[in-house]
């Protein structure tokens, strides 16, 4: 009797093992089958779920020497020529538990870093996933120097090349090919998503583009212009991180309860117009720990003002209030912003010795006139993507310290004006969700856990996961009315203090009660 009762289990175990062995065998032989133009396979390997994958070839500046992989998958590493003098490093990760979906990841900053955490995240969700190094290695802009082909890879070609090759490989690896194609990226990755929408409208069925770095050239100039406002850390116009906390606390005091709840979160930064004069130190004050000087107050006012060009034209909107604590260490730190310095040195002026401390708004005009390969990514007519049936879901943290969320609002307005469509019509294919309490792509003081990556994960249900919400929109026609964010007690994996439904633009969240502010149903999108 015992042997008979074990037979079904043994049969099932054998079937599972055979399936596993077949997948490993397919992976082991796959490299020999890849004979695509300009594609040079470095290696193909089977990676079991639970492996802490070492990444010895990842540039040290990318900050990732290993990556935990949650799902069994076949890893394909290759180089792909993009011209006679340039190539991208590309990886494709094919999960054993495949859902029939293809996905491309993006990049960040000026970096030439494959975002292995996004590969692991999306492969773990069953996507056949690709990621590339943007045509160079490391986070510096130095590879752009006198190398326009590398700039072209960075502007658009790396992502598109990876998509073309990745789709071919997916069809080769899985006999069923793929049903739908998706994109997931934030920051530079958000810009890359919109570049695909604008230039290659048939590449993706669904694009999730967070905190997009479009209006790119002006973003570069906006980021460096803060130094001309704050000066160095010895200037009387400079604010220390401690002084920025004083400013931040006052801004929150003035603007927190505009939404109806005192929770430390500004729900709609458009309604926040802080009066900074309230914290100028009184004449003769002996204790200046909770106030700032008049010169510093002027710095704050200028930092929170739009950025205009030499002819008075708007180049970039203001930094949204509420991001002061996060921004104090990166763009208000008394040094020219590093990515901007690199862009001007190695792209705009081709001069590694260019002095970033001498930057003026005239330099912004030079950079914008150059706009190599239309890296601005600012085209407002996305009708080709609309006609192709594509969907785009974009989000932007309203505590973003690197890319103002006001810029995403500006692009939304430009698309509406260019295409002659109001919010109801745009909702059919383009939905934008400002996320209160979210910093740059992740982190922040509020409910930032929206599932755009491993660092914001709070479940794979569409209502809790911005990527899976896009899948549901594309495959079932159910468009997201909101995206739910989780407020973690101590980062991803810790307890969830509360959740909040972030409204789709141009709606905004208002506290109505009767429950506590931590009750998501006590809020209403108006």
From Swiss-Prot:
Gene from which the chain derives: faeB-2
Leading EC class: hydrolase
GO biological process: xylan catabolic process
Pfam families reported in the protein's UniProt record: Tannase (PF07519)
GO molecular function annotation: carboxylic ester hydrolase activity; feruloyl esterase activity; metal ion binding
Family: Belongs to the tannase family.
Binding-site positions, Ca(2+): 256, 259, 261, 263, 265
Segment forming the signal sequence: 1-18
Catalytic activity: feruloyl-polysaccharide + H2O = ferulate + polysaccharide
Alphabetically ordered keywords of this record: Calcium, Carbohydrate metabolism, Disulfide bond, Glycoprotein, Hydrolase, Metal-binding, Polysaccharide degradation, Secreted, Serine esterase, Signal, Xylan degradation
Active-site residue list: 187, 400, 440
Protein known as: Probable feruloyl esterase B-2
Function: Involved in degradation of plant cell walls. Hydrolyzes the feruloyl-arabinose ester bond in arabinoxylans as well as the feruloyl-galactose and feruloyl-arabinose ester bonds in pectin.
Disulfide bonds, paired cysteine numbers: 27-74, 62-113, 186-441, 255-272, 281-291, 503-525
EC number per UniProt: 3.1.1.73
Glycosylation positions in this chain: 52, 137, 233, 516
Cellular localisation: Secreted
Highest taxon above the source species: Eukaryota
GO cellular component terms attached to this protein's record: extracellular region
